[in-house]
Amino acid sequence: MTVGVTYSRRAAAELEEITAFLLEYSPLVAQRFTAAIKRAELQLADFPNSGAPGIRPGTRRLIVGDYILSYRRRGADVDIFAVRHAHRRDARL
């Protein structure tokens, strides 16, 4: 069963900021990052528990390249609440 995948406002802003940074660095890198995020969304829609358990109860993490998508189930859907570079101290939400 495919579920919906949504982003919190904060996660959407983080994703936008990362994409803008990558666009300045290299449009090709930004394009590859965006494609990887889309693949991750499809994976979560089909397999919502495919990420590793997060530190906080009820959360999970999915690694996408150098980034970590932190998410939780909201009813039947998946809510991504953080998008962080893996080297950030707070990436392990």
Predicted segments with their positions:
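Enriched for short, Lys/Arg-rich terminal
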Residues: 24, 64, 68, 72-93
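Basic, Lys/Arg-enriched alpha-helical interface segments
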Residues: 1-59, 93
